[in-house]
Amino acid sequence: MDTLLEAIDVCNVDGFCFGNYTNEEAGTGCTVIVAPEGATGGVDVRGGAPASRETDLLRPENTVDTVHAVCLSGGSAFGLEAASGVARELESRGIGLPVGPTQVPIVCSSCIFDLAFGDPTVRPDIEAGIAAVREALDHTPATLEQGNVGAGTGATVGKLMGPATCMKAGLGAAAVALGPVKVGAVVSVNACGNVVDPFTGEWVAGMRVAADSDQIVDMELAAFAAAGSMQMPLDRTNTTISCIVTNVELTKAQATKVSQMAADAYAHAIRPTHTTNDGDTIYTLASGKLGAQASAAVPLDLLGMLAVRALQTAIVNGAKTAKTSHGIPGAAK
């Protein structure tokens, strides 16, 4: 299958623009995925502690079927404010659901907990959301920057035993093309678990043996060894949030199924994952730029497999490109 797949930049998935807002000093930021002409959306919320906006709107039985942006943000629940800035900027550009006197942009959002990483009093706000949209639409980067940027600025992994032995992670992106079908993924990797490269089996980032060590320990084995005495000091402070994008035309139900299938990428690249202390959320946006006839010929299961491939690669990229920051070591040299 690898001989048929072409690795492309996520910015080459038709119908979408991407932008970051980064506050490196405060250790937080946000990332926006904009669909200027709208996209059909779906979502899978699998973690036990999500911070999100407009996820109920994406349920297949609900009325609105067009999404104009997804905002991935730091700041925990405070970071949901950035989505209001995204909506405000899109409205000013005439992007949104027509409602008579104006347009209402449909903006979904999820946040990671990064308040313990940098300055907990600084969170992505309305101005941050506006800045991210302006980067996406005014500068239209050909390549989405990864690592310590956007929603990945304050992301960390390997936190089973607390912050002293965790590692830096960040924003990751990847995309693949199979003929005219394009599927991409953007992810903020802020997991309780370790990141493993599913293609090699090697640890990329995660819990270290000690604060002064670079050796990564298998968190699952550590948990088994600790048995009932294990305590998790960072309850509800972990979330891996992501957005799948595709040029295929989908219904809301189909987009939701792609999100559900894409959750396999978390299991492939993060160990453990979907814990009660993670708020794992996966959005899917379908632009339909491939066209109705060509899209109808694409099996939904195939699309889901492509989403898994893109997302697991993006997760690994988010860990590999993260640099040491605020005293927490990263895998990028």
Language-model region placement:
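A structural signal for small-residue-enriched, beta-sheet-centric alpha/beta enzyme cores
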Residues: D2-A77, E81-S84, S92-K333
